[in-house]
């Protein structure tokens, strides 16, 4: 099956699953997350990339008035694909934290958007580079932090990774993320757009080799150490003396969040 068609069908499946499990929830958008967004997905007999998504939902009047805890959960589909569901208020806070796993949905080619909120979504996408540079220092720290987390996880026998750890001694998916973070922070620090950073893969073959656990354990550990250390050095090189908050990006986020929730509440009340 042609790749894009397959991904579109999986997004639709996630949407239908969302409606079935959370029929009372008002959806803003469901967006693709993961390897397909940066050109590192694989579809072979040996390895098949999951199609995982993030869903942004809009709170109800009751949730706001009664100050209920905003939803933030992960629903696992029967095929083990993940659907992360998060209140728009929490999701926009994650934009401000500059976590690239949350920012990447602004640049995906695969999303289901609730037609009622298309105007707000289009405005969000029109300002995606602004939002992705809300706090450059924080973005750099986040990239370095992700590299460190992946390095710690690379040989840890998590239940879902136990087979890989027992067979290879490490999880190649974590190693390929360490290399990816190194590419990303270099491109970001050198002034490339966030969109360019997502697909900046000068060593793509090495990353695929890592993802498929084709390095020996000794090689993998050395690569992880070298790339993680270089990422830390690049973070220190590009960090500015003080954090600078992009006020225009903040205004955009506040405006979209306000207008989106207002539209939902107006419809609910009237």
Question: Which sequence ranges carry the predicted segments?
Answer:
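Conserved aromatic-histidine-acidic binding/catalytic patches
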Residues: 3, 45-46, 79-80, 166-173
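Active-site nucleotide-donor binding segment shared across nucleotidyl transfer reactions
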Residues: 17-68
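N-terminal regions immediately upstream of nucleotidyltransferase
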Residues: 1-14, 207
């Amino acid at each position: 099956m042609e790749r894009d068609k397959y991904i579109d069908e999986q997004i639709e499946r996630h949407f239908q699953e969302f409606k079935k499990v959370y029929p009372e929830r008002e959806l803003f958008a469901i967006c693709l997350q993961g390897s397909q967004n940066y050109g590192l997905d694989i579809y072979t007999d040996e390895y098949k990339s999951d199609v995982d998504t993030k869903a942004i939902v809009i709170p109800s009047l009751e949730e706001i008035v009664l100050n209920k805890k905003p939803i933030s959960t992960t629903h696992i589909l029967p095929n083990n694909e993940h659907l992360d569901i998060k209140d728009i208020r929490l999701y926009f806070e994650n934009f401000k934290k500059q976590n690239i796993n949350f920012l990447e949905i602004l640049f995906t080619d695969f999303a289901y958007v609730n037609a009622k909120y298309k105007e707000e979504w289009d405005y969000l996408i029109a300002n995606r580079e602004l939002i992705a540079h809300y706090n450059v220092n924080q973005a750099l720290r986040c990239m370095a932090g992700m590299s460190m987390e992946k390095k710690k996880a690379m040989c840890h026998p998590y239940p879902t990774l136990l087979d890989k750890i027992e067979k290879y001694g490490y999880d190649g998916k974590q190693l390929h993320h360490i290399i990816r973070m190194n590419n990303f922070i270099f491109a970001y620090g050198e002034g490339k757009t966030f969109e360019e950073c997502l697909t900046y893969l000068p060593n793509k073959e090495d990353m695929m080799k890592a993802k498929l656990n084709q390095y020996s354990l000794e090689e993998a550990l050395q690569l992880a150490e070298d790339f993680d250390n270089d990422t830390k050095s690049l973070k220190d090189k590009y960090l500015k003396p003080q954090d600078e908050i992009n006020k225009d990006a903040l205004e955009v986020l506040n405006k979209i969040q306000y207008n989106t929730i207002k539209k939902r509440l107006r419809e609910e009340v009237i």
